[in-house]
Amino acid sequence: MKILYLSAYFQPEVTSSSYLSDNRNQAFAYRGYEMVVYTPMPTRGISEELRSEYKSRKTEIMYDGKMVVHRFNLMREGRNPITRALRYAISCIKQLYFGIFGKDARKCDMMFISSTPPIQGAMAAIVKKVRGIPMIYNLQDIFPDSLVGTGMTKKGSVLWKIGRVIENFTYRNADKIIVISEDFKQNIIEKGVPEDKIEVIYNWVDENAVVPIPKEKNDLFDELNISRDKFNVVYAGNFGHAQNIDIILKAAEKLKNNTEICFELFGTGGLKDHFINKAKELSLENIHFHPLQPYNRVSNVYSLADVGIVSCKKGIGKGAMPSKTWSILSAGTTVVANYDKGTDIENILTTNDIGLFSDANDIDAFVNAILKLYNDRELCKDMGVRGREFIINNLTKDIGTSKIINIVEQIKANIIR
Protein backbone atom coordinates (compact mmCIF):
# COMPACT_ATOMS: atom_id res chain seq x y z
CA MET A 1 0.00 0.00 0.00
CA LYS A 2 1.49 3.33 -1.11
CA ILE A 3 0.72 6.80 0.20
CA LEU A 4 1.18 9.93 -1.92
CA TYR A 5 2.36 13.18 -0.30
CA LEU A 6 2.14 16.45 -2.20
CA SER A 7 3.93 18.68 0.27
CA ALA A 8 4.83 22.38 0.24
CA TYR A 9 7.64 21.81 2.76
CA PHE A 10 9.77 18.80 3.55
CA GLN A 11 12.93 18.01 5.47
CA PRO A 12 15.54 19.42 5.82
CA GLU A 13 13.31 22.51 5.97
CA VAL A 14 12.66 23.85 9.45
CA THR A 15 9.07 24.62 10.44
CA SER A 16 7.29 24.53 13.78
CA SER A 17 5.61 21.25 12.82
CA SER A 18 8.54 19.48 11.12
CA TYR A 19 8.78 16.91 13.90
CA LEU A 20 5.15 15.88 13.38
CA SER A 21 5.82 14.94 9.75
CA ASP A 22 9.01 13.12 10.67
CA ASN A 23 7.29 11.13 13.43
CA ARG A 24 4.36 10.26 11.18
CA ASN A 25 6.61 9.12 8.33
CA GLN A 26 8.64 6.96 10.70
CA ALA A 27 5.42 5.36 11.93
CA PHE A 28 4.19 4.68 8.39
CA ALA A 29 7.52 3.10 7.43
CA TYR A 30 7.55 0.98 10.58
CA ARG A 31 4.05 -0.31 9.74
CA GLY A 32 5.15 -1.26 6.23
CA TYR A 33 3.60 1.56 4.22
CA GLU A 34 5.49 2.93 1.23
CA MET A 35 5.44 6.68 0.57
CA VAL A 36 5.97 8.86 -2.49
CA VAL A 37 6.66 12.58 -2.03
CA TYR A 38 6.63 15.44 -4.53
CA THR A 39 7.98 18.65 -3.02
CA PRO A 40 9.88 21.82 -4.05
CA MET A 41 13.57 22.35 -3.43
CA PRO A 42 14.00 23.16 0.27
CA THR A 43 13.93 26.84 1.23
CA ARG A 44 12.54 27.53 4.68
CA GLY A 45 14.93 27.69 7.63
CA ILE A 46 18.01 26.44 5.77
CA SER A 47 21.25 28.01 4.54
CA GLU A 48 21.98 28.90 0.93
CA GLU A 49 24.76 26.29 0.97
CA LEU A 50 22.38 23.50 1.96
CA ARG A 51 19.83 24.64 -0.61
CA SER A 52 22.54 24.50 -3.28
CA GLU A 53 23.31 20.90 -2.33
CA TYR A 54 19.71 19.91 -2.97
CA LYS A 55 19.62 21.47 -6.43
CA SER A 56 21.40 18.38 -7.72
CA ARG A 57 19.51 15.99 -5.46
CA LYS A 58 16.33 15.50 -7.46
CA THR A 59 15.45 12.10 -6.01
CA GLU A 60 16.10 10.79 -2.54
CA ILE A 61 15.38 7.46 -0.85
CA MET A 62 14.55 7.58 2.86
CA TYR A 63 13.32 5.42 5.74
CA ASP A 64 15.16 2.30 4.60
CA GLY A 65 13.68 2.42 1.14
CA LYS A 66 10.10 2.99 2.26
CA MET A 67 9.96 6.56 0.92
CA VAL A 68 11.01 8.10 -2.39
CA VAL A 69 11.22 11.91 -2.48
CA HIS A 70 11.03 13.78 -5.79
CA ARG A 71 12.11 17.43 -5.66
CA PHE A 72 11.42 20.04 -8.33
CA ASN A 73 12.97 23.45 -8.90
CA LEU A 74 11.20 26.47 -7.46
CA MET A 75 12.28 29.97 -6.48
CA ARG A 76 13.32 30.60 -2.90
CA GLU A 77 10.59 31.64 -0.48
CA GLY A 78 10.62 35.34 0.43
CA ARG A 79 8.85 37.50 2.97
CA ASN A 80 6.69 39.40 0.50
CA PRO A 81 3.15 37.91 0.74
CA ILE A 82 2.51 38.40 -2.98
CA THR A 83 5.65 36.57 -4.11
CA ARG A 84 5.00 33.89 -1.50
CA ALA A 85 1.47 33.39 -2.83
CA LEU A 86 2.88 33.17 -6.37
CA ARG A 87 5.37 30.55 -5.23
CA TYR A 88 2.57 28.53 -3.61
CA ALA A 89 0.52 28.73 -6.82
CA ILE A 90 3.39 27.55 -9.03
CA SER A 91 4.17 24.75 -6.58
CA CYS A 92 0.56 23.55 -6.60
CA ILE A 93 0.41 23.60 -10.40
CA LYS A 94 3.52 21.45 -10.59
CA GLN A 95 2.24 19.09 -7.91
CA LEU A 96 -1.08 18.80 -9.71
CA TYR A 97 0.81 17.62 -12.77
CA PHE A 98 3.00 15.19 -10.83
CA GLY A 99 0.04 13.91 -8.81
CA ILE A 100 -1.83 13.00 -11.98
CA PHE A 101 0.98 12.01 -14.35
CA GLY A 102 4.00 11.22 -12.15
CA LYS A 103 5.25 7.66 -12.66
CA ASP A 104 5.58 6.92 -8.95
CA ALA A 105 2.45 8.89 -8.07
CA ARG A 106 0.36 6.68 -10.32
CA LYS A 107 1.37 3.67 -8.22
CA CYS A 108 -0.09 5.21 -5.04
CA ASP A 109 -3.32 4.04 -3.46
CA MET A 110 -4.22 7.09 -1.34
CA MET A 111 -3.13 10.64 -0.54
CA PHE A 112 -2.17 12.28 2.76
CA ILE A 113 -2.35 16.06 2.33
CA SER A 114 -1.60 18.88 4.76
CA SER A 115 -3.39 22.23 4.80
CA THR A 116 -0.41 24.49 4.04
CA PRO A 117 -0.76 26.40 1.78
CA PRO A 118 -4.56 26.84 1.80
CA ILE A 119 -4.87 25.84 -1.87
CA GLN A 120 -3.01 22.56 -1.27
CA GLY A 121 -6.17 20.68 -0.36
CA ALA A 122 -8.09 21.94 -3.39
CA MET A 123 -5.23 20.91 -5.67
CA ALA A 124 -5.21 17.43 -4.12
CA ALA A 125 -8.98 17.23 -4.52
CA ILE A 126 -8.54 17.65 -8.27
CA VAL A 127 -5.92 14.88 -8.26
CA LYS A 128 -8.43 12.71 -6.42
CA LYS A 129 -11.15 13.38 -8.98
CA VAL A 130 -8.86 12.52 -11.88
CA ARG A 131 -7.11 9.55 -10.26
CA GLY A 132 -10.00 8.19 -8.22
CA ILE A 133 -7.91 7.61 -5.07
CA PRO A 134 -9.01 8.57 -1.53
CA MET A 135 -7.64 11.62 0.28
CA ILE A 136 -6.90 12.18 3.96
CA TYR A 137 -6.75 15.91 4.74
CA ASN A 138 -4.68 17.01 7.73
CA LEU A 139 -6.18 20.35 8.80
CA GLN A 140 -3.65 22.37 10.80
CA ASP A 141 -4.95 25.82 9.94
CA ILE A 142 -8.52 26.84 9.09
CA PHE A 143 -8.63 29.01 5.98
CA PRO A 144 -9.89 31.71 5.44
CA ASP A 145 -10.56 32.14 9.19
CA SER A 146 -6.83 32.42 9.83
CA LEU A 147 -6.56 35.34 7.39
CA VAL A 148 -9.25 37.19 9.30
CA GLY A 149 -7.46 36.50 12.58
CA THR A 150 -4.16 37.90 11.32
CA GLY A 151 -5.80 40.99 9.87
CA MET A 152 -5.07 40.13 6.22
CA THR A 153 -8.74 40.29 5.25
CA LYS A 154 -12.24 40.71 6.68
CA LYS A 155 -15.17 38.33 6.87
CA GLY A 156 -17.34 38.85 3.81
CA SER A 157 -14.54 40.29 1.65
CA VAL A 158 -13.83 39.00 -1.85
CA LEU A 159 -10.73 37.17 -0.59
CA TRP A 160 -12.73 35.62 2.24
CA LYS A 161 -15.44 34.43 -0.19
CA ILE A 162 -12.83 32.89 -2.49
CA GLY A 163 -11.30 31.20 0.55
CA ARG A 164 -14.64 29.73 1.56
CA VAL A 165 -15.14 28.28 -1.94
CA ILE A 166 -11.69 26.66 -1.78
CA GLU A 167 -12.38 25.41 1.75
CA ASN A 168 -15.75 23.86 0.87
CA PHE A 169 -14.35 22.18 -2.25
CA THR A 170 -11.53 20.64 -0.21
CA TYR A 171 -13.75 19.40 2.62
CA ARG A 172 -16.32 17.97 0.22
CA ASN A 173 -13.71 15.87 -1.58
CA ALA A 174 -11.74 14.67 1.44
CA ASP A 175 -12.53 11.14 2.60
CA LYS A 176 -11.30 11.90 6.12
CA ILE A 177 -10.39 15.20 7.74
CA ILE A 178 -7.98 15.18 10.67
CA VAL A 179 -8.38 18.24 12.91
CA ILE A 180 -6.17 19.23 15.83
CA SER A 181 -8.81 20.27 18.35
CA GLU A 182 -12.47 20.01 19.29
CA ASP A 183 -12.73 23.71 18.39
CA PHE A 184 -11.62 22.93 14.84
CA LYS A 185 -14.13 20.09 14.64
CA GLN A 186 -17.02 22.30 15.70
CA ASN A 187 -15.89 25.02 13.29
CA ILE A 188 -16.08 22.84 10.20
CA ILE A 189 -19.24 21.03 11.36
CA GLU A 190 -20.90 24.45 11.40
CA LYS A 191 -19.72 24.84 7.80
CA GLY A 192 -21.56 21.69 6.77
CA VAL A 193 -18.92 18.96 7.09
CA PRO A 194 -20.46 15.65 8.27
CA GLU A 195 -19.26 14.71 11.74
CA ASP A 196 -18.40 11.15 10.71
CA LYS A 197 -15.85 12.53 8.24
CA ILE A 198 -13.89 14.27 11.02
CA GLU A 199 -11.29 12.81 13.38
CA VAL A 200 -9.76 14.82 16.23
CA ILE A 201 -6.05 14.08 16.72
CA TYR A 202 -4.21 16.63 18.80
CA ASN A 203 -0.71 17.47 17.64
CA TRP A 204 1.50 15.40 19.88
CA VAL A 205 4.92 16.12 21.30
CA ASP A 206 7.92 13.80 21.26
CA GLU A 207 8.06 13.20 25.00
CA ASN A 208 11.58 11.80 24.70
CA ALA A 209 12.86 14.87 22.83
CA VAL A 210 11.14 17.54 24.96
CA VAL A 211 11.97 16.79 28.59
CA PRO A 212 12.48 18.68 31.86
CA ILE A 213 16.07 19.86 32.34
CA PRO A 214 17.18 20.94 35.84
CA LYS A 215 18.19 24.60 35.92
CA GLU A 216 21.72 23.81 37.06
CA LYS A 217 22.21 21.56 34.00
CA ASN A 218 20.60 23.91 31.48
CA ASP A 219 23.46 25.63 29.63
CA LEU A 220 21.09 28.01 27.83
CA PHE A 221 21.05 30.17 30.97
CA ASP A 222 24.78 30.78 30.56
CA GLU A 223 24.74 31.14 26.78
CA LEU A 224 22.09 33.88 26.89
CA ASN A 225 23.09 35.38 30.22
CA ILE A 226 19.73 34.60 31.83
CA SER A 227 19.59 34.44 35.60
CA ARG A 228 18.73 31.14 37.27
CA ASP A 229 17.58 33.07 40.34
CA LYS A 230 14.84 35.10 38.64
CA PHE A 231 11.25 34.01 38.02
CA ASN A 232 11.40 33.58 34.25
CA VAL A 233 8.29 34.02 32.11
CA VAL A 234 8.98 32.57 28.65
CA TYR A 235 7.30 33.01 25.28
CA ALA A 236 8.63 31.09 22.28
CA GLY A 237 7.20 31.22 18.78
CA ASN A 238 6.13 33.60 16.06
CA PHE A 239 5.99 37.37 16.50
CA GLY A 240 2.89 38.17 14.46
CA HIS A 241 -0.57 39.71 14.75
CA ALA A 242 -2.31 36.53 15.87
CA GLN A 243 -0.05 35.85 18.87
CA ASN A 244 -0.93 39.11 20.67
CA ILE A 245 2.62 39.88 21.81
CA ASP A 246 1.27 43.25 22.97
CA ILE A 247 -0.33 41.57 26.00
CA ILE A 248 3.10 40.27 27.05
CA LEU A 249 4.65 43.73 26.77
CA LYS A 250 1.77 45.19 28.79
CA ALA A 251 2.32 42.57 31.48
CA ALA A 252 6.03 43.34 31.56
CA GLU A 253 5.22 47.04 31.91
CA LYS A 254 2.87 46.40 34.84
CA LEU A 255 5.48 44.21 36.54
CA LYS A 256 8.57 46.29 35.75
CA ASN A 257 9.02 47.32 39.38
CA ASN A 258 9.33 43.68 40.43
CA THR A 259 12.97 43.01 39.62
CA GLU A 260 12.58 39.28 40.37
CA ILE A 261 10.29 38.64 37.39
CA CYS A 262 11.84 38.58 33.90
CA PHE A 263 10.25 38.02 30.50
CA GLU A 264 12.35 36.01 28.02
CA LEU A 265 10.98 35.99 24.46
CA PHE A 266 12.29 33.60 21.79
CA GLY A 267 11.30 33.59 18.16
CA THR A 268 11.09 35.23 14.79
CA GLY A 269 8.48 36.89 12.63
CA GLY A 270 7.67 40.05 10.73
CA LEU A 271 6.79 42.06 13.83
CA LYS A 272 9.73 41.11 16.04
CA ASP A 273 11.63 44.35 15.40
CA HIS A 274 8.46 46.31 16.12
CA PHE A 275 8.13 44.71 19.55
CA ILE A 276 11.83 45.13 20.32
CA ASN A 277 11.53 48.85 19.56
CA LYS A 278 8.33 49.13 21.57
CA ALA A 279 10.00 47.54 24.60
CA LYS A 280 12.81 50.09 24.27
CA GLU A 281 10.32 52.96 24.04
CA LEU A 282 8.69 51.74 27.25
CA SER A 283 12.12 51.37 28.91
CA LEU A 284 11.35 47.77 29.83
CA GLU A 285 14.51 46.33 31.32
CA ASN A 286 12.67 43.19 32.45
CA ILE A 287 12.06 41.86 28.93
CA HIS A 288 14.68 40.29 26.66
CA PHE A 289 14.44 39.05 23.08
CA HIS A 290 16.34 36.00 21.81
CA PRO A 291 16.65 34.14 18.48
CA LEU A 292 14.35 31.21 17.76
CA GLN A 293 16.08 28.05 18.96
CA PRO A 294 16.24 24.80 16.94
CA TYR A 295 13.87 21.97 17.86
CA ASN A 296 16.61 20.04 19.65
CA ARG A 297 16.82 22.90 22.15
CA VAL A 298 13.12 23.23 22.92
CA SER A 299 13.71 21.41 26.21
CA ASN A 300 16.30 24.03 27.18
CA VAL A 301 14.00 26.91 26.26
CA TYR A 302 10.99 25.77 28.26
CA SER A 303 13.03 24.32 31.12
CA LEU A 304 14.55 27.71 31.85
CA ALA A 305 10.98 28.97 32.26
CA ASP A 306 9.09 29.00 35.52
CA VAL A 307 5.99 29.55 33.40
CA GLY A 308 5.42 29.39 29.65
CA ILE A 309 3.05 31.74 27.84
CA VAL A 310 0.37 30.79 25.32
CA SER A 311 -1.45 33.84 23.94
CA CYS A 312 -3.69 34.89 21.08
CA LYS A 313 -5.42 37.91 19.65
CA LYS A 314 -9.00 38.07 20.92
CA GLY A 315 -11.48 36.30 18.66
CA ILE A 316 -9.17 33.86 16.87
CA GLY A 317 -8.59 31.24 19.58
CA LYS A 318 -11.09 28.75 18.20
CA GLY A 319 -9.30 28.79 14.85
CA ALA A 320 -5.91 27.91 16.30
CA MET A 321 -4.34 25.33 18.60
CA PRO A 322 -0.74 26.25 19.46
CA SER A 323 1.40 23.11 19.66
CA LYS A 324 3.78 25.01 21.93
CA THR A 325 1.27 24.29 24.71
CA TRP A 326 2.27 20.62 24.61
CA SER A 327 5.99 21.43 24.46
CA ILE A 328 5.71 23.62 27.55
CA LEU A 329 3.91 20.86 29.44
CA SER A 330 6.30 18.16 28.22
CA ALA A 331 9.19 20.18 29.66
CA GLY A 332 7.46 20.08 33.05
CA THR A 333 6.64 23.79 32.96
CA THR A 334 3.35 25.41 33.96
CA VAL A 335 1.31 27.15 31.26
CA VAL A 336 -0.09 30.65 31.68
CA ALA A 337 -2.61 31.23 28.91
CA ASN A 338 -4.17 34.47 27.75
CA TYR A 339 -6.60 33.01 25.27
CA ASP A 340 -10.22 33.05 24.15
CA LYS A 341 -12.66 31.67 26.69
CA GLY A 342 -14.58 28.52 25.83
CA THR A 343 -11.69 26.97 23.91
CA ASP A 344 -9.94 23.62 24.23
CA ILE A 345 -6.98 25.29 25.90
CA GLU A 346 -9.12 26.65 28.73
CA ASN A 347 -10.80 23.29 29.24
CA ILE A 348 -7.56 21.27 29.22
CA LEU A 349 -5.65 23.59 31.56
CA THR A 350 -8.43 23.99 34.11
CA THR A 351 -9.75 20.42 34.05
CA ASN A 352 -6.30 18.92 34.57
CA ASP A 353 -4.98 21.70 36.85
CA ILE A 354 -1.84 22.16 34.76
CA GLY A 355 -1.89 25.91 34.25
CA LEU A 356 -3.70 29.18 34.78
CA PHE A 357 -6.07 30.68 32.25
CA SER A 358 -7.15 34.25 31.55
CA ASP A 359 -9.41 35.59 28.83
CA ALA A 360 -7.67 37.11 25.80
CA ASN A 361 -6.82 40.80 26.32
CA ASP A 362 -7.65 40.68 30.06
CA ILE A 363 -4.36 42.17 31.19
CA ASP A 364 -5.23 42.28 34.89
CA ALA A 365 -6.16 38.58 35.01
CA PHE A 366 -3.04 37.72 33.01
CA VAL A 367 -0.75 39.62 35.38
CA ASN A 368 -2.52 38.16 38.42
CA ALA A 369 -1.95 34.64 37.07
CA ILE A 370 1.78 35.31 36.76
CA LEU A 371 1.90 36.81 40.25
CA LYS A 372 -0.04 33.92 41.74
CA LEU A 373 2.55 31.43 40.51
CA TYR A 374 5.42 33.75 41.43
CA ASN A 375 4.12 33.94 44.99
CA ASP A 376 3.32 30.22 45.24
CA ARG A 377 6.30 28.30 43.87
CA GLU A 378 4.99 24.96 45.15
CA LEU A 379 1.78 25.41 43.16
CA CYS A 380 3.85 26.37 40.12
CA LYS A 381 6.05 23.30 40.50
CA ASP A 382 3.12 20.92 41.12
CA MET A 383 1.27 22.15 38.02
CA GLY A 384 4.41 21.55 35.97
CA VAL A 385 4.71 17.99 37.24
CA ARG A 386 1.04 17.31 36.44
CA GLY A 387 1.54 18.83 32.99
CA ARG A 388 4.31 16.37 32.19
CA GLU A 389 2.10 13.51 33.40
CA PHE A 390 -0.74 14.77 31.18
CA ILE A 391 1.53 14.58 28.13
CA ILE A 392 2.75 11.07 28.97
CA ASN A 393 -0.81 9.83 29.38
CA ASN A 394 -2.42 11.60 26.43
CA LEU A 395 -0.19 13.26 23.86
CA THR A 396 2.91 11.18 23.19
CA LYS A 397 4.35 10.47 19.76
CA ASP A 398 3.16 6.85 19.84
CA ILE A 399 -0.38 7.80 20.85
CA GLY A 400 -0.68 10.43 18.10
CA THR A 401 0.86 8.42 15.28
CA SER A 402 -1.17 5.33 16.20
CA LYS A 403 -4.38 7.31 15.75
CA ILE A 404 -3.26 8.42 12.28
CA ILE A 405 -2.31 4.84 11.38
CA ASN A 406 -5.81 3.75 12.41
CA ILE A 407 -7.37 6.23 9.97
CA VAL A 408 -5.11 5.02 7.16
CA GLU A 409 -6.08 1.43 8.01
CA GLN A 410 -9.76 2.37 7.70
CA ILE A 411 -9.17 3.89 4.26
CA LYS A 412 -7.10 0.86 3.26
CA ALA A 413 -9.91 -1.49 4.29
CA ASN A 414 -12.38 0.45 2.13
CA ILE A 415 -10.02 0.25 -0.86
CA ILE A 416 -9.60 -3.51 -0.50
CA ARG A 417 -13.32 -3.97 -0.04
Language model regions located:
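Nucleotide-sugar-dependent
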Residues: 243, 290, 294-301, 308-329, ...
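Nucleotide-activated donor-binding/catalytic signature segment of Leloir-type glycosyltransferases, i.e.
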Residues: 259-260, 264-267, 273-299
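Membrane-proximal helix-turn-helix segments that form the acceptor-binding/catalytic region
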Residues: 100, 119-122, 126-130, 157-179
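A short, well-ordered alpha-helix in the C-terminal region of glycosyltransferases
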Residues: 365, 372, 379-393
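Conserved donor-binding/catalytic core segment of Leloir-type glycosyltransferases
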Residues: 227-243, 249-252, 264
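N-terminal subdomain of nucleotide-sugar transferases
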Residues: 1-61, 417
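Carbohydrate-associated surface elements
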Residues: 41, 183, 204
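A short helix/loop element that forms part of the nucleotide-sugar donor recognition site in Leloir-type
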Residues: 53-59, 211-226
